[in-house]
Amino acid sequence: MIYIFGSGLAGLSAAISLHKSGYKVTIISKKINGGSSYWAKGGIAAAVGNDDSPELHKIDTLEVGDGLCDSKTVDYVTREIRYVVSTVEKWGFKFDDDLRLEGGHSKRRILHKTDDTGREITNFLLNLAKKKGINLIEDKLLALKVKDGKVAGFITEKGGSFDAEKVVLATGGYGYLFKFTSNPSTNIGDGIAIAFKAGALVSDTEFVQFHPTVTTFDGQAYLLTETLRGEGAILVNERNERFVFKYDSRGELAPRDVLSRAIYDQYKKGHTVYIDLSPIEDFDRKFPILSNYVKRYGKRLQVFPGVHYTIGGIRVNTRGESNIKGLYAIGEVTDTGLHGANRLASNSLAEDLVYGVNLVRYIDNWEGLSIDDVKEVIEVRLRNSSNRLSLEEIREYNWNYLGIVRNGEGLDKLVKIYESNDTFNDNASLVSLLSAKGALLRTESRGAHYREDYPNKSWEDGKRIYFMVSRN
């Protein structure tokens, strides 16, 4: 039996692929239909157009990743996604015929299903998993059992203790640890914290991606997909100034980190920022879901950057293998090196599918993550304390000190807060500590990580920060 924790795109695609090859699979998830995949609006980046190629997709990914992408991983994903997309289509999923353009991409390569791709494909895979008879259980992972560097099992809240030689973590990221986010409340980094406490290597936790255009409908955060700007939507302030070209010559199609800081700067200067959807031709047909909201709210919507994706996580190789034998990790819970310092739009669902569908190739042929080339690992001591912050306090702290623009004074304060907190029992505090500590240590600005006291890129390309739990 192979146990997969998480029922988003990565977990479901892995389960179906394994099941089709004859493996017994059980999916365990805090909420079967509650992950981030449902909220992905744009689509899946794949070089399937006649004027496109994996090499061009790779170039765009490396450019946006700002010197921190793992070239081998980028090669793997940009090449394999075309095969994986055809596999999912053979399973019965149908993408819309047209390819769309998003920020940072040099070609139209975004495969989509209406303007709600994440929900459409995740629902399809969930229904397929149910039809295949794959066991789906709602439960919460509490701990991994590891013996002599190998997975021995796990403990869940309801089910108790289980023995297992192979565990797949697909539990998502930690975006809900910030006050303003497009992520669901399940995304608090549990999988990362549990793996870390078990001895897994964790990296790149300082890189938190803010999506530039989040709005609110009916009091709820709503992601306004990158595709809107690819189809002609523009950003303006209350003076109707199209301000983005002051910050980047690519305008509305600049990478997310650039636009997020530009919008943040506009608000800091006293302006209000809107996205104007009126230039989009045939809007109702292209964006039928959003169109329902626009009929009530209009085509000029106030926007603000919100946390959308967390780049750091469990360090894995291109096979989804961690440094603990038998522990695989796929999806946003990982740090594969694909995204570098900043994720290219619609590469996350591509990564989910490539690592999920292809896991079957490696499940019986363990190689493990090689850490021989890791020059320095920072050990972090866990604290068992009665001092415990509420989740809302953590979200407020992270938004204030670990947000779009950071500085050493705020980060140092934040690290000290979490170091005095219960990081042994509280996963949210532990992951927040790793993120804040990474941001404090990275004394430069790169990609999604911006330090106003170190505004320039100064570290050598490829240098990343690794954490491991201290056993002393």
Curated annotation (Swiss-Prot):
Keywords: Cytoplasm, FAD, Flavoprotein, Nucleotide-binding, Oxidoreductase, Pyridine nucleotide biosynthesis. Its main location: cytoplasm. It is an enzyme of class 1 (oxidoreductase). The keyword rRNA processing does not apply. Its cofactor is FAD. Its EC number is 1.4.3.16. Pfam families: FAD_binding_2, Succ_DH_flav_C. InterPro entries: FAD-dep_OxRdtase_2_FAD-bd, FAD/NAD-bd_sf, Fum_R/Succ_DH_flav-like_C_sf, Fum_Rdtase/Succ_DH_flav-like_C, NadB, Succ_DH/fumarate_Rdtase_cat_sf. It is found in: Cytoplasm. One of its GO terms (molecular function) is L-aspartate oxidase activity. The record marks 102 as: Important in orienting the L-aspartate substrate. Pathway: Cofactor biosynthesis; NAD(+) biosynthesis; iminoaspartate from L-aspartate (oxidase route): step 1/1. Binds 1 FAD per subunit. GO terms for cellular component: cytoplasm. It catalyses: L-aspartate + O2 = iminosuccinate + H2O2. FAD binds at residues 7-10, 36-43, 190, 332, 348-349. PANTHER family: L-ASPARTATE OXIDASE, L-ASPARTATE OXIDASE, CHLOROPLASTIC. Catalyzes the oxidation of L-aspartate to iminoaspartate, the first step in the de novo biosynthesis of NAD(+). Belongs to the FAD-dependent oxidoreductase 2 family. NadB subfamily. This is L-aspartate oxidase.
